[in-house]
């Protein structure tokens, strides 16, 4: 697909593992990415920052990194800043885009200011009175609601709340993961979609139909009964418009090259963006490989394409 001589990449580290709540997912993603790059002839090597200092990348002659870390310091700008310091090119967004992309609260603030539609929401702080805030939030946003930590990925600790009585406990649970909790109005009627972004590839939208209440961690990485619809069933002109809006949602956060933008449609077909992912999962259940496969791009070709974006100025 790319026609790139794999020698151009030099010695490549596949960063995976790490210390976040998404470590196990990252280990799976990283192993597959490593194999995909090696299948294409890339000089790729495993590197787990939880086990080795990042300075070893420079000491051992790595010139490029494929970031398969998920959540925590692998996705919040810290690894990106360190790689910048060591002069190592890497996949995905830089410090700013990574930091904003993992912070759902500040993501939504930017979107509100730049005209990207996002569900109405409230924030709750860890030391707030959960019962009092729950009463206020239900009065303002109604039910059902989604409760999520501001800075976790893979739907870690995301809860759907259908009754006012259940909201205080959901707030308390989410607050164990982050000092800021997002409470978001549930958008009903049109389904959940994702737009995968990989440079100039025109990847199809995917409609996600989980067997359970919503697309949670289990549905993403464990369950085999989640449906991924490609084509997504939308008219071509609407799909093209949503892809453009997804790219805007990605770009206004300072995100670059590679990632995902997730959104809901309401019954009237209006889009509401939930979050971006600047280091998407690359497991057997993950969405970018599915989107690529639908247009004839293999897993190995996809990871080479993503890595090739690090060759750009």
UniProtKB/Swiss-Prot annotation:
Q: What class of enzyme is it?
A: ligase
Its UniProt entry gives the catalysed reaction(s) as: 2 D-alanine + ATP = D-alanyl-D-alanine + ADP + phosphate + H(+)
Which residues participate in Mg(2+) 2 binding?
A: 275, 277
Q: Which InterPro entries match?
A: ATP-grasp, ATP_grasp_subdomain_1, D-Ala_lig_Van_CS, D_ala_D_ala, Dala_Dala_lig_C, Dala_Dala_lig_N, PreATP-grasp_dom_sf
What Gene Ontology terms describe what this protein does at the molecular function level?
ATP binding; D-alanine-D-alanine ligase activity; metal ion binding
Q: How is the cofactor bound?
A: Binds 2 magnesium or manganese ions per subunit.
The Gene Ontology biological process terms listed for this entry are: cell wall organization; peptidoglycan biosynthetic process; regulation of cell shape
Localization terms from the record:
Cytoplasm
Q: Which SUPFAM superfamilies match?
A: Glutathione synthetase ATP-binding domain-like, PreATP-grasp domain
Q: What positions does the domain ATP-grasp occupy?
A: 108-308
Its cellular-component GO annotations read: cytosol
E.C. number: 6.3.2.4
**Residues annotated as binding Mg(2+) 1:** 262, 275
Instruction: Name the domain of life.
Output: Bacteria
Binding of ATP, residues: 138-193
> Which pathway, metabolic or otherwise, does it act in?
Cell wall biogenesis; peptidoglycan biosynthesis
Q: Which UniProt keywords are listed? A: ATP-binding, Cell shape, Cell wall biogenesis/degradation, Cytoplasm, Ligase, Magnesium, Manganese, Metal-binding, Nucleotide-binding, Peptidoglycan synthesis
Spell out the Pfam families in the cross-references.
Answer: Dala_Dala_lig_C, Dala_Dala_lig_N
Please list the cofactors this protein needs. Answer: Mg(2+); Mn(2+)
**Function text:** Cell wall formation.
Give the family per the record: Belongs to the D-alanine--D-alanine ligase family.
Q: What's the protein here called?
A: D-alanine--D-alanine ligase
Q: Which organism is it from?
A: Burkholderia multivorans (strain ATCC 17616 / 249)
The taxonomy runs:
Bacteria, Pseudomonadati, Pseudomonadota, Betaproteobacteria, Burkholderiales
């Amino acid at each position: 697909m790319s026609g790139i001589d794999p020698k151009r990449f030099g010695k490549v580290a596949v960063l995976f593992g790490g210390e976040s709540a998404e470590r196990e997912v990252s280990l799976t993603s990283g192993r597959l990415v490593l194999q995909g790059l090696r299948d294409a002839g890339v000089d790729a090597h495993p590197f787990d920052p939880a086990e080795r200092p990042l300075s070893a990348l420079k000491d051992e002659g790595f010139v490029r990194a494929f970031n398969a870390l998920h959540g925590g310091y692998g996705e919040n700008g810290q690894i990106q800043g360190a790689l910048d310091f060591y002069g190592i090119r890497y996949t995905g967004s830089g410090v700013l885009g990574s930091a904003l992309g993992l912070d759902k609260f500040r993501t939504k603030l930017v979107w509100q200011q730049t005209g990207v539609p996002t569900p109405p929401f409230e924030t709750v702080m860890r030391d707030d009175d959960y019962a009092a805030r729950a009463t206020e939030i239900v009065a303002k946003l109604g039910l059902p609601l989604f409760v999520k930590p501001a800075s976790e990925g893979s739907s870690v600790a995301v809860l759907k709340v259908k009754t006012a009585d259940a909201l205080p406990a959901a707030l308390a649970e989410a607050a164990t993961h982050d000092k800021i909790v997002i409470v978001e109005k549930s958008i009903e009627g049109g389904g959940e979609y994702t737009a995968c972004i990989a440079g100039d590839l025109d990847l199809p939208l995917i409609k996600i139909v989980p067997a359970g209440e919503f697309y949670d961690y289990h549905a993403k990485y464990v369950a085999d009964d989640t449906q991924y619809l490609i084509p997504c069933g939308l008219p071509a002109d609407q799909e093209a418009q949503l892809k453009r809006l997804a790219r805007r949602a990605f770009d206004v956060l300072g995100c670059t090259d590679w990632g995902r933008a997730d959104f809901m449609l309401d019954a009237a077909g209006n889009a509401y963006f939930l979050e971006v992912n600047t280091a998407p999962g690359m497991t057997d259940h993950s969405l970018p490989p599915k989107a690529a496969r639908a247009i004839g791009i293999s897993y190995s070709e996809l990871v080479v394409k993503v890595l090739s974006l690090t060759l750009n100025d």
